Amino acid sequence: MHPAAEHSPLGKSSEYIATYMPSLLFPIPRTAKWAELGVTAQTLPWHGVDYWNCFELSWLLPSGKPVVAIGEFAIPADSPNIIESKSFKLYLNSLNQTVFATIGELQACLEKDLSAAAGKPVSVQVRTLAEVEAQGVVALPGQCIDALDVTISNYEQPQPELLRCNPERVVEETLHSHLLKSNCPVTGQPDWGSVVVEYKGRALDHASLLTYLISFRQHADFHEQCVERIYLDLKNLLQPEHLTVYARYVRRGGLDINPYRSTGAISPENVRLVRQ
């Protein structure tokens, strides 16, 4: 478990406060997990963003009438802190009986509080239900590897030694899988995800990638760190010209978390998958 997470509200019974309280947000420094991966804030080998989507966002108009919407939050991948997910939920619930005259006023409040917790500017979009409904759901790009016939029996820790490539052959391809699963390091609850790997480098053996991703199945870590581990393991193996790892997780507690890590500085669209 991350030592800071032990003091978070995650896994504990909590009072649900319905009036604005930004102090509910619980930041967790990224540095400890980065150290496990052998990187520091000064040597991060990726660009990226963590997209969070909130499906339980509500507040009051000055008339007392409630409004519901969907919140989209973009937290820079190099921010000093992640925000613990239950504290994020509790904070958002504290807006339920709080008055905001306009969406812009709410958005400014969210950006201020979340940026303070993350330690770097957080971008916020508050979208109407009609907007999100019109967007619909999308399919992941590239080739799905889930139908490959693989054998695996160890699910406790990620196993980068399972990965194989052909160092004599360079390819550019996009692969995806819906079989990513890990567990919350505090509660043990399952985190279900889909992941895209896009790269140009040594030709990756597709079956080895699938068994490697499945090896996360009982691993306990936060979403962001799982994606960073996948990124680094692939980077070390493939020596790629470019590499992107993008995971989209199923929501828990009204929030889904979608980490994106890439050699390039371009951020992807925040689009929903069928399980989201």
UniProtKB/Swiss-Prot annotation:
Q: What is this protein called?
A: NADPH-dependent 7-cyano-7-deazaguanine reductase
Spell out the family assignment given in the record's similarity comment.
Belongs to the GTP cyclohydrolase I family. QueF type 2 subfamily.
Q: What are the EC numbers? A: 1.7.1.13
Q: Name one GO molecular function term.
A: preQ1 synthase activity
Instruction: Check the record and name the SUPFAM superfamilies matching this protein.
Output: Tetrahydrobiopterin biosynthesis enzymes-like (SSF55620)
Residue positions of the active site: 184, 191
The scientific name of the source species is Pseudomonas putida (strain W619)
- Which InterPro entries does the record cross-reference, listed alphabetically? GTP-CH-I_C/QueF, NADPH_dep_7-cyano-7-deazaG_red, QueF, QueF_N, QueF_type2
Q: Which UniProt keywords apply?
A: Cytoplasm, NADP, Oxidoreductase, Queuosine biosynthesis
Binding positions for substrate per the UniProt entry = 83-85, 223-224
Query: One GO CC term of this entry?
Result: cytoplasm
User: Which Pfam families does UniProt cross-reference here?
Assistant: QueF, QueF_N
Q: What does this protein do?
A: Catalyzes the NADPH-dependent reduction of 7-cyano-7-deazaguanine (preQ0) to 7-aminomethyl-7-deazaguanine (preQ1).
Cellular compartments annotated: Cytoplasm
Reaction(s) catalyzed by this protein? 7-aminomethyl-7-carbaguanine + 2 NADP(+) = 7-cyano-7-deazaguanine + 2 NADPH + 3 H(+)
Q: Which domain of life is it from?
A: Bacteria
Pathway stated in the Swiss-Prot or TrEMBL entry? tRNA modification; tRNA-queuosine biosynthesis
Annotated residues that bind NADPH are located at: 85-86, 252-253
Which BP terms does GO give this entry? Answer: queuosine biosynthetic process; tRNA modification
Report quaternary structure and partners. Homodimer.
